[in-house]
Amino acid sequence: MDDPTFVWRAPIGTVVLIALALRDRARTGTWSRARELGVLFGAALGAMAYALAHDAVTWSISREYFSIGKGLPEAATSFAPVARLALLAGWSAGLAVGLALVIANNPGRLSRLPERALAPELGRVVAYALLGAGTCAALGAASEPCLGVAIADAGVLSPRSYLVAQGAHAGSYLGAALGAAVSVARVRRARRWLSERRPSPSPGPSAVA
């Protein structure tokens, strides 16, 4: 996950996407592609903020989870490598969620939702991620009697804290995946609802005759 190319790939990718949005504006006269990009970047930035806050909490709970479990020995004394890892993971996960919502709202036979209607669904994904993190963190703590010895044998001094942090990370991913699936289903259902209530086109004069 610690990709040194990210520092130049992300800006270049951003410029390319903006250029595509401007070209689409010139060709169609609308900002539909730009609004879709707004959803993507909003999801990515939101996920990065969540990941940074989440990892700050789990790092405070168990530095060993990062220094041993994630293979970041410098994380034992510094949050910097943890923050870098969080931003990378958040960027990728956020783009994936945003892309799923944009595709679910892609034009077709169904009516399209305005992009602003997707914002609550992004919030729903975050809520599911938080719920998953809390639930799995509790399960991690409860698993100490079963897994604590094995974790300690790996050199971990505080197995319970390690398992709590590990559970929180697994739960965040599971919760976000479930939340994204629910949100995609909700977007599709909302589009069907709009389509069913869309007035049918009036028949032309030739059809009436």
Region annotations inferred by a language model:
Residues 1-17:
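Hydrophobic transmembrane alpha-helical segments in integral membrane proteins
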Residues 8, 79-95, 157-181:
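Hydrophobic alpha-helical transmembrane segments
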Residues 17-25, 91-109, 172-196:
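Transmembrane alpha-helical segments in integral membrane proteins
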Residues 26-46, 116-129, 181, 185-186:
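Alpha-helical transmembrane segments and their helix-start/interface "positive-inside/aromatic belt" motifs
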Residues 49-61, 131-147:
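C-terminal TM-helix exit segments that contain a strictly Trp-centered aromatic cap at the helix terminus
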Residues 64-79:
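Perimembrane loop-to-helix junctions flanking transmembrane segments
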Residues 72-74, 147-165:
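Short, membrane-exposed interhelical loops at transmembrane-helix boundaries
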Residues 192-209:
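Short, highly charged, low-complexity non-transmembrane loops/tails of multi-pass membrane proteins
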